[in-house]
Amino acid sequence: KDDEWWKGRRVWLGLDLSLSEDNVCVDMKTYEGDDKDNAVLYTKTMGFIPAGKIAQKSKREGVDYNTLIRNGCCIACGDEVIDYTKVEEYVLTLEEKLGVEIVQIGYDRWNAISSIQKFENAGYECVEIKQHSSVLHSPTKWLKECILSGRYWYEENLMLEINFQNARCTEDTNKNKYVNKKKSVEKVDQVVGNINSTYLIEQELLYGGDGFVAQVG
C-alpha cells in the first residue's frame, strides 16, 4: 500500500520501545471488516536503530541494516543509543503526513513513560498493554490466524519479515501462547509492536470502542 491509501483511515499504533540501545518499533495498523472472523488487517511498520551501532549490529545479527534504511524499513537516529525524540516526532507527525486518525496508542510500560506523556499531552489516548501471556495470548493467536488465512497485509518490509522469522512462541501453564523475547532468535520488536496494535483492534471489534479494555492477569 502506498501512503495515499492510508488517507482518511482510523489507525491504532503498537509500540515496542524496549531499551534505548536496542531496536524500537512503531507499528501502525487499520482494518476492514465487522468482526474478528472476517476482519482484514493492514499494517505499516517502522523500525528505529542507533545510528552509531549500524556496523556492529549488522555484523552481530547478520542483517544488512544499511539496506533496510535505504529501503525505508527503519530509521537510524542517535549514536550509541536511540534518540527517542525522533521516535516521538515520527508518531506525532503521522496524522499530518498520512492523513490518518490515530485512535489509540498501545505500549508496554517499560522505558515508555516519557514518550507516552508527550503523546498524552498531544491529546492521544494511550493504553498500557500488560506484557503477560494472559493478555497477549488472544491477539497473538488472532494475528497468526489472520496471517495464515491471507487477512494480513503489510507494506513490503524485509525487516518485518526477518523479525517474524526470529519470533518464537512459548506456552504458559494455561496453554496460552505468547512471543518469548528471551527464547526468540535475535530481534522481534516489530512482532511485538504488531501484537500490541492487534490487541487494540481486537478490543475495538469485541467491545465497539466504548473505552472498555479487558486485561486479565
Give each language-model segment a name.
Residues 1-131, 137, 141, 158-217:
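RNase H-like, metal-dependent nuclease domains and their acidic two-metal-ion catalytic environment used
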